[in-house]
Design a protein with these regions (language model features):
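Short beta-strand-centered segments that line the small-molecule binding cleft or hinge
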Residues: 153
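ATP-dependent carboxylate-amine ligase catalytic core
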Residues: 17, 21, 25-36, 61-149, ...
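Short Gly/charged-rich anion-binding patches and loops
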Residues: 5, 55, 119
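A conserved segment at the C-terminal end of the G1
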Residues: 39-42, 51-68
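Non-catalytic interaction surface on structured domains
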Residues: 7-11, 30-39, 56
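Short N-terminal amphipathic alpha-helix/helix-capping patch enriched in small hydrophobics
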Residues: 6, 20-24, 39, 52
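Charged, amphipathic alpha-helical linker segments immediately N-terminal to NTP-binding catalytic cores
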Residues: 1-17
Length: 176
């Protein structure tokens, strides 16, 4: 399988059924819980999440940490989403992960963001990441990034009124 074929398969994955973290949690369990291997700074909000992750990434780099960063969406190449102190996730790692995921039998097939999140956490474990900055995707309690098990800090950027209903209804509920 080529990198381009792996990406085509990933992009074709659509979430089916009810939103929630159960699919990504099942996926992470099959991978031996890579999310347990690093501390995370979970970045949530409507705007500015990518900037906060970039600032954190720069701070981690300056401190000489073995770090990871997970953001979305990417601008040019999927590998921009998943980075460590050693660079972006290699094409070969993406192909290897997709080949594995395609062969697995799933009760509820994981969607694109579930798969991308699991790949990021797996890659962080493989690269010996100690601390990762992780940007939430769709946000709210059903976001795949909520499968993180060792959150050291949560950063909440601004929350737009257009997202309040989906995230809890009020700013107070979102903050909880």
């Amino acid at each position: 399988m080529t990198y381009e074929e792996a990406l085509a398969w990933l992009y074709a994955r659509r979430r089916t059924g009810e939103r929630g973290t159960h699919r990504v949690r099942a996926l992470l369990a099959r991978l031996g819980h890579p999310e347990a291997g690093f501390l995370a700074v979970h970045v949530l909000g409507t705007n500015g999440k990518g900037s906060v992750v970039a600032y954190l990434e720069a701070a981690f780099r300056a401190a000489g940490l073995a770090y990871g960063a997970y953001t979305s969406p990417h601008l040019v190449d999927f590998r921009e989403r998943i980075r460590t102190h050693l660079g972006p996730v290699p094409r070969e790692a993406v192909v290897r992960f997709v080949a594995w995921a395609r062969e697995e039998a799933w009760e509820e097939p994981p969607g694109f963001f579930d798969l991308a999140t699991a790949l990021a956490f797996l890659h962080f474990r493989e690269r010996g990441v100690a601390l990762a900055a992780v940007e939430a995707g769709v946000g709210g309690e059903k976001d795949a990034t909520n499968a993180l098990s060792r959150v050291a800090l949560t950063v909440l950027t601004n929350v737009g009124e257009d997202h309040l209903e989906a995230l809890g209804g009020t700013l107070e509920a979102v903050a909880r």
